[in-house]
Amino acid sequence: MTDATIRHDHKFALETLPVSLEDEMRKSYLDYAMSVIVGRALPDVRDGLKPVHRRVLYAMHELKNNWNAAYKKSARIVGDVIGKYHPHGDSAVYDTIVRMAQNFAMRYVLIDGQGNFGSVDGLAAAAMRYTEIRMAKISHEMLADIEEETVNFGPNYDGSEHEPLVLPTRFPTLLVNGSSGIAVGMATNIPPHNLTDTINACLRLLDEPKTEIDELIDIIQAPDFPTGATIYGLGGVREGYKTGRGRVVMRGKTHIEPIGKNGERERIVIDEIPYQVNKAKLVEKIGDLVREKTLEGISELRDESDKSGMRVVIELKRNENAEVVLNQLYKLTPLQDSFGINMVVLVDGQPRLLNLKQILSEFLRHRREVVTRRTLFRLKKARHEGHIAERKAVALSNIDEIIKLIKESPNAAEAKEKLLARPWASSLVEEMLTRSGLDLEMMRPEGLVANIGLKKQGYYLSEIQADAILRMSLRNLTGLDQKEIIESYKNLMGKIIDFVDILSKPERITQIIRDELEEIKTNYGDERRSEINPFGGDIADEDLIPQREMVVTLTHGGYIKTQPTTDYQAQRRGGRGKQAAATKDEDFIETLFVANTHDYLMCFTNLGKCHWIKVYKLPEGGRNSRGRPINNVIQLEEGEKVSAILAVREFPEDQYVFFATAQGMVKKVQLSAFKNVRAQGIKAIALKEGDYLVGAAQTGGADDIMLFSNLGKAIRFNEYWEKSGNDEAEDADIETEISDDLEDETADNENTLPSGKNGVRPSGRGSGGLRGMRLPADGKIVSLITFAPETEESGLQVLTATANGYGKRTPIADYSRKNKGGQGSIAINTGERNGDLVAATLVGETDDLMLITSGGVLIRTKVEQIRETGRAAAGVKLINLDEGETLVSLERVAEDESELSGASVISNVTEPEAEN
């Protein structure tokens, strides 16, 4: 090492400056972040493209790889792109080309590919040396007019080439094909849309720039995915359009086919899947769920997809509900998926979050700039051509002199000097201007010096004109046609007038944009692929539950369960029946009713509170199952028992819950008052000391009410109440003692029509009740029946049953309507043979009847096998009972279950235990 080298190194070391590592990292990271954001990850709001997409299309355009030309090898295009414009790996460029050619990834493909470009199953494309591509026809609309100085160009990475910084696209590519990308600290995810819908929104915004975003959303409505499927619910979509961030829920499109001659089995066929879902992985996921027994209703799974379309077949087991399995697939697999909207784009080189209207407005602003720049370019070109035409006119007017001048000049330079040095005769130029109706200034190209052109002395040629004359051959000079020159000049003048008019009138630019958008819509518009279900939403547990009629049983010890009604076949009267539930010693089933799995169970307790729960949430068990303690299903206080249960589907304002207590008190409350029940329950009725709730039923406000006592008596009255101006507030507490004596005097009088004066006034949940039936000391209400007055003509009858298993059916008409508060009349004999009355219900001739004993035995029998008798008759044997066993409940199973909507039975409810 020489001394000079040492001195040089020492000098270099002395010039080293200390730098803060923190500052350097911050600066370098920000530079890198902005490079990724602007140069790689985010699309430009104007043309909807990221740099790599733009460079691919421009390279194909430069190679004239047009839609109607021969295909070129993908490797050729990749080489041009990375060599001229995109200094990155070839795989990144080829992956971009592949995606732009996939009809399941792009709503409108921008590249026409030939060969294997991958599949919806996630299969990779063939290598670039095997595939061939060319531009799709619609891609030419993105590059239209690019040679007319419509967009800015910039140098490529090494300054050897120039590339467009944006494309002059004629349609809103950003929305039409969408975009996705992950930058540093931000990301974008924009779904594709239907071209027709998007252009219609642009046209609306062109006509009315102040159009509200809601109106634009009404036009576009939702994304339109290349794989079709169904947009499920519009709440998240609208949020995304309004704020730039939202969520699109997508469901695969399916249909259900029967299997077998009788259609005893079904299959689900998947025709379309959500956007960006891998079909092979979807099928694999379904198979895994079947193997794990998470999905138990599927017997076979196969993919029958081919070139004609998608077809994934899911065969179901016998008696499986296809709709329920389908909802399980939606919940557990990507057959239902979501697309997160995050519309972050580059606006003037800066990342911004835009809403739908802002994106459309930015596109239209871009189109306005493109049309303006294109018109300026064409005006400049027309003026230049006019300038050249004037050269021809001058040459024709002075042809002999010009030929002589050229011949006498020793070289071209001297000839040019002579042409520029003097004015020339300009009669033909003046004639052309006169015919066109334009002044000379409108024709002058920009930048032309003042002493050039038509002057008083004649016409002074420009250097461009002189060069053009010298380049003309003698044959061309002598062959100039005056008429042709004048006609050509006139056409140029017309174009110039038009271009100047366009530039001076913004409305003309707007019309040009409109016409071009209409043309795009006509040439490329199509129907939506994705259907829209505006009322969709997240899948609730209820969607996965089949609608079935269930027998709900509640034991005296508080065990509840459900069983399908199909578990029981009708038997002849007097049979032994099937075991409905295994009960513990000294426990028995006291309540039984039929409800749909999607019904709400309104559970009213002996303490006058209300709880509710969906039927499908109750434990389902076999005949040997006890069920689950009801206090594990709903929150009950110590000493609180469910004493009445009502099954309802909805909570309309014009319906009521009618209550009856053991001491004969009645009350009604609007059903809607119970639609929001707290976990610990809400108060339903205020009870007097020693009283407890017996029954509850849904009524329409003018139903007939029947109360049955354990002593075999019944009373029938109408609930209708006609409000008068003197009535107190409907939700005020009702004093039960005030009018009892007055009511008793008239209660047993005949009352054939509801008067509205002796009915039951609606009250609030916290109030008490009115006397419905007067009882002796040993009497208590055991059953409540409600029905519409016209039911009397329907053929339905009152069936009563006693503790010792006897019963009968009696026409409703045998029970005359009375005023409420009376002692009632005989319904069935309650002597030693029959025992106390335990339950009553309405039945039809073709119905079945379910009977339940204290031993847990259940029998289903035909009503027609039970003899019809009068009110005073003792009845017939309904069920054979073991010694010490009693009948505790019954339930009608209607031939048409819809008939049950007006009737309810809750029977044999026990008194609350006394506090110690």
From Swiss-Prot:
Cellular compartment(s): Cytoplasm
Give the EC number(s) under which this enzyme is classified. 5.6.2.2
Whether Ubl conjugation counts among this entry's keywords is no
**Which terms are listed as keywords in the entry?**
ATP-binding, Cytoplasm, DNA-binding, Isomerase, Nucleotide-binding, Topoisomerase
Bias category Acidic residues: which stretches? 739-748
Q: Which family does it belong to?
A: Belongs to the type II topoisomerase GyrA/ParC subunit family.
The protein in question is named DNA gyrase subunit A
Question: Which gene name belongs to this protein?
Answer: gyrA
